Structures are given as structure tokens and as C-alpha cells.
Amino acid sequence: MSTEHKKQSLSAVTLAAIGVVYGDIGTSPLYTLRECFSGHYGFDVRPDVVFGFLSLIFWMLILIVSVKYLTYVMRADNAGEGGILTLMSLAGRNTSSRATSILVILGLIGGSFFYGEVVITPAISVMSAIEGLEIAAPALDPYIVPCSIAVLTLLFVIQKHGTGSVGKLFAPVMLVWFLTLALLGLRSIIANPEVLAALNPKWAISFFTEYKSVSFFALGAVVLAITGVEALYADMGHFGKFPIRLAWFTVVLPSLVLNYFGQGALLLKNPEAIKNPFFLLAPDWALIPLLILATLATVIASQAVISGVFSLTRQAVRLGYLPPMRIIHTSEMESGQIYIPVINWTLYLAVVLVIVGFERSSNLAAAYGIAVTGTMVITSVLFCTVALKNWHWNRFFVYFLLVALLVIDVPMFSANALKLFSGGWLPLSLGLVMFIIMTTWKSERFSLLRRMHEHGNSLEAMIASLEKSPPVRVPGTAVYMSRAMNVIPFALLHNLKHNKVLHDRVVLLTLRTEDAPYVHNVNRVTIEQLSPTFWRVVASYGWRETPNVEEIFHRCGLEGLPCQMMETSFFMSHESLILTKRPWYLFLRGKLFIALSRNALRAADQFEIPPNRVIELGTQVEI
């Protein structure tokens, strides 16, 4: 590729990263500084307080986003992919089984926190933009909630159609948004350049020394400036490290700093502007265009969050932490563009209830932060584990780095934990529900498979017996889904027991999820002939991939085992779960597992096998 083409490609990817990765953090100027002076903390709009908050915001953007995430955390990738579950997987590779269990729990807590915060993010972003109506026309105040719901309803409805065509507009719109942030801020800074003194960290330090405990509580508002910081790491696989870093340092960070300091300059000049300093930065003639642009930007930010939920859910499903569910690919070109109906509509219902219940973005701000800062603490611990165990960094440097990260993260988390009764219970409750679901599905599924393995018949002995004294053979190929490599599938046993026949060719198909986002086609399928009529096929997929039976058959044909979909019968085992006597808490967990199993996507639907080729055989299993 020529140098010119490389530059064009880098520019395109960097622009795309601006449109997707930075949507959430890019819309935080709508509400962050306003919330710092909300009645929760009791600060008057005085120069020293304005300087203190601006200094805190600036250095938080530098230390947490620029240093922690962009410089350190993004080094931890699995074949280019990032995210809290990826970090969890990396951290557990070279540790003891006990330590791995602890790290897995931490990773699942972090993932659960994400589900909790994701309900708040679209609501607070869109409501903050729509609240600009108050400035343009105060009489429209009663319509803020209905308008916010209408905008988000449209966003969730179009998810099933994919965002491929509309998504092309995301990057240009967000670029215009960031340039607008910069211009509005610069215009105000030029009028009051003394606000730039807040770049000096002494203002942040003096803010803490003067206001002591109250300033500590105010960290709960300052954290709003870094909403969506996890997206930088989670979306690394889509865009790559360098474009994400380039977009931050050349466009996003300068625009955010200029806008925050522009709002601060406005407050120094006119303290009354605290009612909505972002929209009051704009001249009167630009208010309506800014309102429209802000709404578009918050919709794009919400879209990025929704896409993030879909990606995290698919990863959790493929890693066995959530039950199988319908995943629809909305693009033939981009494997990352997916739609999960049950997640989409559950999230929509939760967001609408949050908007109706909290009514104002200021009320929602009181609920935000506790989960995201908890995830930040977990990320620091997991990253330092990877640095120590996987990369073998100097032990003393890793300990120093961990302490340095926690010195920032723990106070942030502690300050936000104080929001528990003012709204912080919401993301924690939602996160707790997801944590219970994920741990229940993983542990109960493991116990179920272990029980089936213990009571199963040996594969080798069974095949030898069948070849020695074969039952009646019928023409064609039979495929049996096999979870365990050395145990006869239940469906095969029941077919022999009730039908007393066997196909001329029997394929035992095992699907394996590797600890990687993708598996190369060369390593996709391995075939082993177990006897003249039995074959074992193991198909390997990464956790970002969706298994496809037609593709497996194609690879089998290339490896010398031709299979035709419409000439093959697929035998599936369907377990009817019976709950045995347990302690009450395990009994409840068992009930939840049974409910999840009943609503899980059947294997035939999961792998898109034609219904007329599927035969399901039921079996009762005690758990």
C-alpha cells in the first residue's frame, strides 16, 4: 500500500473512531460542570470553586483517559480486542486456580456494572440535550420527558435494520460536534482568558485543602466528565490502538478542554449562567441549531452504548456466561454489527422507566458514577495482574503503578458510593441482577455437564460395541451435537434405545469456543475418523464469531468428509431439568437456571439448521 493510501486509510479509521468511540465522553460537557454546582454539594459559583472544578476535570482527563487507559490499559489486548471480559481472560491465564476464580469474579462484576450504567447513559445524554428547549422556549419544559422518550424510541426501533447506512453519518456529525465544542469554548475563553489559570494543578489541590470533605463528595459530579471511558478500551478491536489515540489527542481532548474552560469563563463573567452553561455559551441565533446538533450527538452516543451492550452480550454468550439468544447480523460486511432483540427491548423498557422515574438529567446524574468507578478499580487490578503475570514487568514497578492507579480510582469510587441512596442503587441493582444471572448460568451449566458426563457411556467402548454388533443401518448421515469429547451424546443413546437404528455415517459434532476473538479458517475444523462409520468433528470459533453449520460442512468437504445439508439429519438432545433437594438459596438459583434454560435459544435455531432436518430427543436430568 502506498504512503498516500495509508494516510487516507488512517484518516478514515480515525474519523470513524471519533464517531463511535468518543460519543459518550464527547457529550459529557452538556451536563458535567452544571452538576458540579448542583444543590447536592452546596457550592456557590465563585472563582476559586470554578478554577478548582476545571482543574479537577482537566487533570482527570489527562490522568485517567490519557495516561491510564490510552497509555497503559490499551496495551492489554487479545488479538487486538479489548474490554473488561477480555482483560479478565488475559489476567487468568498464568495464575493459580484460586486466583483465577477471584479474577473471574472481578471481571464479571465489572461486566455487570457496565449493564447497570448502560441504562442511565442514553437517558441522561438525550435528556440533557432536549433540556436545551428550556433555554430556547421555557414553555416547552413539560415536553422534555415525552420528547426524550420519542427520540430514544426511534433509536431502539431502527436497531433491527442495522446502522450501516446511517452509521456513515456518525463520524462527520461527531466531528462537527467536537469542532462546535471547541469554537464555543474558544469564543468564551478569548473573552475571559484568565480561566486558563485552572490548568495549574495547584487549583485542584487547594480545592481539596480548602473545602475538605465537601470537595471529596464533589468527585461524584466530576466523574461525569469521563463517562464512556471504558468504550476506548472495549472498541479497540474495531479501530485499533493508534487511531483511537490519534483521535483523542488531536480532536477530542482539545475540544473537551476548550469547551469546559469556555463554560468556566462564562461562569466567571455571569454566575447566573450555571442553570445551563453549555447552551448559554452559544449566541441566541445558534441556539436551535446547537440543540439539534446536541440531540444528534447524544443519539450517536447512545447508539455506541447500545452497540457496546450487544457486543458484550455476544461475548458473554460465547464464553458461557449467558444463555444462548438470537443474534442477528445486520451487515454482511461487518461481523461486529449485530442486533439482539431481547437485549434491545429489555434495555429500551429500562431506559424509558428511568426517564419517567427520574424526570430530569440532574436527578439521573445522582445515579451515575458508582458502577463506572467500580469498573475502573477492577480494570486497574486486572491490568496490573496481566502486566505482572503475563508480561513479567518489574514487580516493584507494577506495585507502584497499581498504587498510583488506585490512589485515583478508590477515592473516585468512594465518593460515588455516597450516591447509593440518591440514585446509585439503580445501576448497582441492575448490575447485581446481571451478576446473579451470569454466575448462575455458568456454574449450573458446568454442574449439569459434569453430571451428564459422570452418567454417560464411554465413547470408545460404545463405538467398538456398535461396530462389532451393528444395529439396523439406514442410508444417510446423522449429526449428533456432542458437548463432551469422550462421552456418547444422549441423543444417540435415545435414538438407539427407541428407534434401534443407526445411519450409515455418524458424525459427532463438538463446537468449541477458543480464548480468542477469531479463529483462522485453517484451524476452524479438525476431523478424526473413530471407526469405519463414526467421525468426530471439532469446530473452533472465537468469541466474536457465530458458529455456522453450513460453513462447518464446507470445511468438512475440503478435509475429505463431504456432507450435504439436505441429506443430513441433526439429532439434538433437549434436557428437561428436575430440581433435587437443595438449601433454599441453591434452590432459588436452580429455579432461575431452569427458567433461563427454558427461554434459551435452541441449538437448531442458534446454528441456523433447517427445521425439517432436526430431530429433538428429550431426556430428564436431575440438577
From Swiss-Prot:
One of its GO terms (cellular component) is plasma membrane. Pfam families: K_trans (PF02705), K_trans_C (PF22776). It is a multi-pass membrane protein. Responsible for the low-affinity transport of potassium into the cell. Likely operates as a K(+):H(+) symporter. This is Low affinity potassium transport system protein Kup. PANTHER family: LOW AFFINITY POTASSIUM TRANSPORT SYSTEM PROTEIN KUP (PTHR30540:SF79), OSMOTIC STRESS POTASSIUM TRANSPORTER (PTHR30540). InterPro entries: K+_transporter, K_trans_C, K_trans_N, Kup. Belongs to the HAK/KUP transporter (TC 2.A.72) family. It comes from Yersinia enterocolitica serotype O:8 / biotype 1B (strain NCTC 13174 / 8081). The chain crosses the membrane at residues 10-30, 47-67, 102-122, 138-158, 166-186, 214-234, 248-268, 277-297, 338-358, 364-384, 396-416, 420-440. One of its GO terms (molecular function) is potassium ion transmembrane transporter activity. The lineage of its organism: Bacteria, Pseudomonadati, Pseudomonadota, Gammaproteobacteria, Enterobacterales. The keyword Plastid does not apply. It is found in: Cell inner membrane. HAMAP family: Kup. The gene is kup. Keywords: Cell inner membrane, Cell membrane, Ion transport, Membrane, Potassium, Potassium transport, Symport, Transmembrane, Transmembrane helix, Transport. It catalyses: K(+)(in) + H(+)(in) = K(+)(out) + H(+)(out).
